[in-house]
Swiss-Prot record:
NCBIfam families: dapB. It comes from Oleidesulfovibrio alaskensis (strain ATCC BAA-1058 / DSM 17464 / G20) (Desulfovibrio alaskensis). It catalyses: (S)-2,3,4,5-tetrahydrodipicolinate + NAD(+) + H2O = (2S,4S)-4-hydroxy-2,3,4,5-tetrahydrodipicolinate + NADH + H(+); (S)-2,3,4,5-tetrahydrodipicolinate + NADP(+) + H2O = (2S,4S)-4-hydroxy-2,3,4,5-tetrahydrodipicolinate + NADPH + H(+). (S)-2,3,4,5-tetrahydrodipicolinate binds at H150, G159, T160. This is 4-hydroxy-tetrahydrodipicolinate reductase.
């Protein structure tokens, strides 16, 4: 069965990648794209409906699955629209507040909603194995993280870095809000044991690099994930759209559910 897909922000870097891969996927059909005025040039060649808002498309495409890598406020707005029309929604947006996440969860009770701060299969496998690594190493090892992204990225730290940090904190039974350190400067004293340093680098056109450090007596372990192209995230989002089309509302689905 072919899955109809609507792509939000189709004129952007991520949107362009997703639309191209949806069109090349034999199990999907590009039903429509959404982009604001002034960024729609070239979208008419896609052979689908082009609109300025999601609400223009959903009434005529109730079975379509929407893929959204836009911005937190826009994604929440789109989740509300999908909930009204019963359309599935795959979200790759990062930077949500706790209140916005709660609203997405509410929408997921009315229509299928899938959210992952990173659509890469590799990152999500990393989230599975990190707790075991941290537990086996024991309390003697300090935990640190560095994330690197392109100079256009708006949120810091990345959503992936925060999820990785949550994973580390959960393995140690710590509260991330209490132990996270995003900035070190000046005479700050010795490093507390219950701390996870999260450092950010921005520059160039780097798609995404995340490195977790476990630093112990006489040795250091580094676990790095590098995304070489946006196609990694687009492929994960398309896979999620196909999976979501077969599922019902009831919870905010994540990569753990799909994998």
């Amino acid at each position: 069965m072919s899955v109809s897909v609507i792509v939000m922000g189709a004129g952007g870097r991520m949107g362009t990648t997703i639309t191209g891969m949806v069109r090349a996927d034999g199990e999907c059909r590009l039903a429509g794209v959404v982009e604001r005025e002034g960024r729609r040039e070239g979208l008419e060649h896609l052979g689908c409906q082009v609109a300025g808002t999601l609400e223009e498309l959903l009434p005529g495409m109730p079975d379509a699955v929407v893929i959204d890598f836009t911005a937190p406020e826009a994604s929440v707005h789109n989740a509300r629209a999908c909930a009204r029309h019963g359309s599935g929604l795959v979200i790759g947006t990062t930077g949500f507040t706790e209140e916005q996440k709660a609203e997405l969860a509410d929408c997921a009770l009315q229509t299928p909603v899938f959210w992952a701060p990173n659509m890469s299969v590799g990152v999500n496998v990393l989230l599975k194995i990190l707790p075991q690594l941290v537990t086996l190493l024991g309390e003697q090892y300090d935990l640190e993280m560095v994330e690197l992204h392109h100079n256009k990225k708006k949120d810091s730290p990345s959503g992936t870095a925060l999820r990785l940090a949550e994973c580390l904190a959960e393995a140690r039974k710590w509260d991330l809000d209490t132990v996270a350190n995003y900035h070190r400067e000046g005479i700050i004293g010795e490093r507390p044991h219950e701390e996870i340093g999260i450092q950010t680098i921005r520059g160039g056109d780097v798609v995404g690099v995340h490195t977790v450090y476990a630093l112990g007596p006489g040795e250091r372990i580094e676990v790095t994930h590098q995304a070489h192209s946006r196609e990694t995230f687009a492929a994960g989002a398309i896979r999620a759209a196909k999976w979501l089309a077969q599922n019902r509302p009831g919870k905010l689905y994540t990569m753990s559910d799909m994998l």
